[in-house]
């Protein structure tokens, strides 16, 4: 990782924690605000630690873009949680042969950039 990239990543990490510090939930309730602040901090720690050993410059760039997208979406919609994705038609076809490969390809294509680090939950 180049020093400039390292500085950019650390800047994003600090930015996420500053956002969490000043976060207000949409409902304005103190309990919900505290839960959302904790979620933001835990999510940042988890994803940054998960990707800390990434050395491929293209993959690092994708992770940076994902982080920036999550920040912008969270601030715009005032929700700290990732927005749900909707599978395309035939995204849940029977798991056999070519149909399975086609289903996996559809799921990969439909996954937005802000969810690339998240594992799929079945």
Curated annotation (Swiss-Prot):
Give me the segments passing through the membrane: none
Record GO cellular component, one term: mitochondrion
Q: Which domain of life is it from?
A: Eukaryota
UniProt cross-references to Pfam families, sorted A to Z: Complex1_LYR
What family, per the record?
Belongs to the complex I LYR family.
Q: What is the protein name stated in its UniProt record?
A: LYR motif-containing protein 1
